[in-house]
């Protein structure tokens, strides 16, 4: 009887002979076949050779026959590897899938040439956005430089001339820029505060009159360490720089294929409802709108992804401002679960990357609190001003307006409706804007409230509540009073 070991050895020898005969037959058939092998076979063989080379450094199972065949065909394997690498390198680029794309590709996926033209056109538009934003940054830098010259307590005659020249250049550039915008974009012209020599001189006079080298002993903020009153001038100068730095493109909707300004109003109305549902801070709402506008200034978005942009912006803003922010599951639920959690997280990373991690836009609330010092923090005035301030996020004319100017205008019109008196020099000092600069803004804010239930329904319903002093109803009562007198 044959031993178990000898029988196993004979079976192994028989198996080796069969494998050797099969491999020789395959090699002979390949050499006798005319022409070159197909591309798919090259792919498969090259993948096998690549895998064998990678596993060579980390052997797990020793296959003697496979290694022998691999060494026999080492020269042909290297050629196959080069062919495979060339084909795959031209075929796809894995780096394009690192970030989720919120743009909607309106073209056929099979038409590669049309897709390339679409990408080239998108790159050109994005470069145009960058150039336009750089022009706006230079204009805002000129404004901030002029303000720094004015706010300096030790202004010399030479510095006055420098500020004067800067203002004249600013006026010329602003006029030419506005004319270009009207000629290119037609009707949509954003609102900006007016600047001229008379306004500059008035501001200089008020600042020199009310600026002090020592803290006011009668000011309660002097004794509150959390208010850091000794640093307030430097803090608000820096906030003015940030509001200019993070200004969105006021005409970004002209480059959006699927979106319109009316759609933005619908999205903001939904954001207001979600914001009120979670009882978040006012700063979170304004920061959300700024993220949306800045993101849309740099990327094209399809209508199917538009709500995702608003939800993700609210999610990021809540993380930045709130102590207890809503979870991603709650935000997804408020979006009717139209997007998965994974889509939310990918879109969040993508939006932060597009915003270049610049999330510290100041918003109007800090400026509104600063202005409230001029009337001893009158509660009714500030509450009504919050209503006027919040309706600005619905109007496309205020997309690129400075939040400090919007806060001053909301406070100004609130004092008029409540009969609190004129816009005093102290208000000019704390706001940085004169009455002449705020009158056009106040007219637009008041006009937007005439059809409040249509223009800003969610905000109107929100400010009907008692905790907001029924501010929206008060404004409607003011209109009825005006109509009855006329």
Swiss-Prot record:
Boundaries of every Cyclin N-terminal domain copy: 234-359
Coiled-coil annotated residue ranges, if any: 122-184
A GO BP entry: cell division
Single annotated GO MF: cyclin-dependent protein serine/threonine kinase regulator activity
Region annotation (Disordered) ranges: 1-80, 105-126
A Pfam entry, by short name: Cyclin_N
GO cellular component: cyclin-dependent protein kinase holoenzyme complex; cytoplasm; microtubule organizing center; nucleus
Assembly behavior: Interacts with IQG1.
Function, in words: 2/mitotic-specific cyclin essential for the control of the cell cycle at the G2/M (mitosis) transition. G2/M cyclins accumulate steadily during G2 and are abruptly destroyed at mitosis. Degradation is necessary for the cell to exit from mitosis. Plays a role in morphogenesis by negatively regulating polarized growth. Through binding to CDC28 regulates cytokinesis, partly by phosphorylation of the actomyosin ring component IQG1.
Family: Belongs to the cyclin family. Cyclin AB subfamily.
Protein name: G2/mitotic-specific cyclin-4
Organism: Candida albicans (strain SC5314 / ATCC MYA-2876)
Gene this protein is translated from: CLB4
